[in-house]
Amino acid sequence: MRDIETIDTLNQLNIDLQGDVSSPLGFIAGGLHCGLRRKKVDFGWIYSTTPATATGVYTLNQFKAAPLKLTEDSINKDKALQAIIVNSAIANACTGEKGMQDALDTQAWIAEQLNIEQHLVGVASTGVIGSFLPMDKIQYATQHVLKEQYNKSEAFNQAILTTDTMTKHLSVKVEIDGTTVTIGGTAKGSGMIHPNMATMLGFITTDANIDANTLDYCLKQSIDQSFNMITVDGDSSTNDMVLCMANGQAQHTQIDALHPEWHKFVYALNFVCHYLAKSIAKDGEGATKLVTVKVKGAHDVVEARKIAKSIVSSNLVKTAVHGEDANFGRIVTAIGYASRYIEPSATHVSLCQVSVLEKGMAVDFDEQRLKEELASDNILIEATVGNGEGEAAAYGCDLSYEYVRINASYRT
């Protein structure tokens, strides 16, 4: 799958599933093992050869981790970053003043190593909550950032992982003003995933020339439709965020909402965010199936999103999917408690393109055919809930015995 390069001819998008955050002009990514984990790469970086316009979206969890708060404050100074540092294994969350000082020290060491201003360094951590970082190991790692033998983007893609079973990355190219613009993305996430930013880190880079306000708007719109529409287990974490850097090294007229081809950039960014979000959902802890829920006919898009999230978050729906059980009553129940604007007599539900509910009433269907469809590793649930114009899609996974095993022994 990752060796495929495709072209979306309709939208003039070149898609490289081997690409990542190092694909756009002027970006370098790398990683190394500094001893936070037993053997695996655990410290990574993204560096732009020139300062980049930057924006981010952050967890809604009230226990925000120190590195997240520091990065948010740093970006707010002048909407720019030049480097991002990430460690896995330890979240540096619920660590008080020492945790914040550790994040500040990491930021300062990187700024000195790269000879850049301190506020241009973003810091991110992911892993076990409540443990302090071994700062001697972190300092060692910062002294090796950008050394040639470690500047391998796949090392960065690996360094940010926790319980993930695979790396998640791609890049896309689109023509703007006759110039090739590249957007690259790398993400991590497998458990503690729920809408409105959860246990996931997402990093997006681009060589596009785009003003800060437009970049911020585009990223937030894309995340509302992608990262905020995935769930694995309903838990939202303390650390996690999506950061986007645009260094402007592609030579084209600056993009803003009035640019005649700005829709191309928006489409490309949406594609990257959706691909990464679905990759996280598919790699949910213990997951065996990707679940896609599409809702239409809702009162508005807000209600459509609530209903789609309700279905994909339901543990009863998730366990039925895992058991390949055509128990559509669980889907109907999740629709019914999600919104007060549901029109039961105008509600239709299909499971794997097999109609199971029409006008609010169960219908006969081919049980054997549906059983065969449910054996697939990609499950589609579609629901029309009325005659409104609201549409939305959400992504999740099944809930398996393996999920319990992984999370019962996470610290051990």
Curated annotation (Swiss-Prot):
EC number: 2.3.1.35, 2.3.1.1
Residues at the catalytic site: T199
Protein name: Arginine biosynthesis bifunctional protein ArgJ
PANTHER family assigned to the protein according to its UniProt record, in alphabetical order: ARGININE BIOSYNTHESIS BIFUNCTIONAL PROTEIN ARGJ, ARGININE BIOSYNTHESIS BIFUNCTIONAL PROTEIN ARGJ, MITOCHONDRIAL
Family the UniProt entry places it in: Belongs to the ArgJ family.
Record note on quaternary structure: Heterotetramer of two alpha and two beta chains.
Residues annotated as transmembrane: none
Keyword Ribosomal protein on entry: no
Gene Ontology CC terms, in alphabetical order: cytoplasm
Catalytic reaction(s) noted: N(2)-acetyl-L-ornithine + L-glutamate = N-acetyl-L-glutamate + L-ornithine; L-glutamate + acetyl-CoA = N-acetyl-L-glutamate + CoA + H(+)
Gene Ontology biological process terms, A to Z: L-arginine biosynthetic process; ornithine biosynthetic process
Compartments in which it is found: Cytoplasm
Disulfide bonds: none
Cross-referenced SUPFAM superfamilies: DmpA/ArgJ-like (SSF56266)
Functional description taken from the UniProt entry: Catalyzes two activities which are involved in the cyclic version of arginine biosynthesis: the synthesis of N-acetylglutamate from glutamate and acetyl-CoA as the acetyl donor, and of ornithine by transacetylation between N(2)-acetylornithine and glutamate.
EC category: transferase
Gene designation per UniProt: argJ
Organism: Staphylococcus saprophyticus subsp. saprophyticus (strain ATCC 15305 / DSM 20229 / NCIMB 8711 / NCTC 7292 / S-41)
Pathway linked to the protein: Amino-acid biosynthesis; L-arginine biosynthesis; L-ornithine and N-acetyl-L-glutamate from L-glutamate and N(2)-acetyl-L-ornithine (cyclic): step 1/1; Amino-acid biosynthesis; L-arginine biosynthesis; N(2)-acetyl-L-ornithine from L-glutamate: step 1/4
